[in-house]
Amino acid sequence: MNPLLQDYARILLEWNQTHNLSGARNLSELEPQITDALKPLEFVKDFKSCLDIGSGAGLPAIPLALEKPEAQFILLEPRVKRAAFLNYLKSVLPLNNIEIIKKRLEDYQNLLQVDLITSRAVASSSFLIEKSQRFLKDKGYFLFYKGEQLKNEIAYKTTECFMHQKRVYFYKSKESLC
């Protein structure tokens, strides 16, 4: 793991002792989550902008932003404690490429359009697509970090799913919605 990701992990574990941001209690529990956040870089199309919905403790957005400093990231996180943590990360790590917005997806009214929309453990895929597709460029993609429950959330093609261990990465183009 690169030094910046190690710094992120260390800070998250420190904050986690008092703020309960993640289920991970030590580095051996957190490292697989960071690896999981970065795995899609092996198959996603290159992107210059990303909207992460429900950023929480920063997974997957912070590892992605650290690995892709040339891309711009908007992190939507409505909870005060988690948004404060994300702002702290921005102040101590080289994360000039992120903007933290303390709002729920449904309340976010910006007109921006991004190349990629990500989400991990937030809501059903159908809900996320319905509420966020207006923020996605016509040639953009959704990337949702899911598990086996995906089959109960939305109809999908097998070509829209990539698997790694127990994770299902749902990767769908906006064009395929039509």
UniProtKB/Swiss-Prot annotation:
EC number per UniProt: 2.1.1.170
Catalytic activity: guanosine(527) in 16S rRNA + S-adenosyl-L-methionine = N(7)-methylguanosine(527) in 16S rRNA + S-adenosyl-L-homocysteine
The keyword Metal-binding belongs to this UniProt entry's keyword annotation: no
Keyword ATP-binding: no
Name recorded for this polypeptide: Ribosomal RNA small subunit methyltransferase G
Localisation: Cytoplasm
Transmembrane annotation, as ranges: none
Entry keywords, A to Z: Cytoplasm, Methyltransferase, rRNA processing, S-adenosyl-L-methionine, Transferase
HAMAP family to which the protein is assigned, alphabetical: 16SrRNA_methyltr_G (MF_00074)
A single MF term (Gene Ontology): rRNA (guanine-N7-)-methyltransferase activity
Any GO CC annotation of this UniProt entry: cytosol
Primary localisation category: cytoplasm
Function, as annotated: Specifically methylates the N7 position of guanine in position 527 of 16S rRNA.
Family: Belongs to the methyltransferase superfamily. RNA methyltransferase RsmG family.
Residues binding S-adenosyl-L-methionine: G54, L59, L105, E106, R120
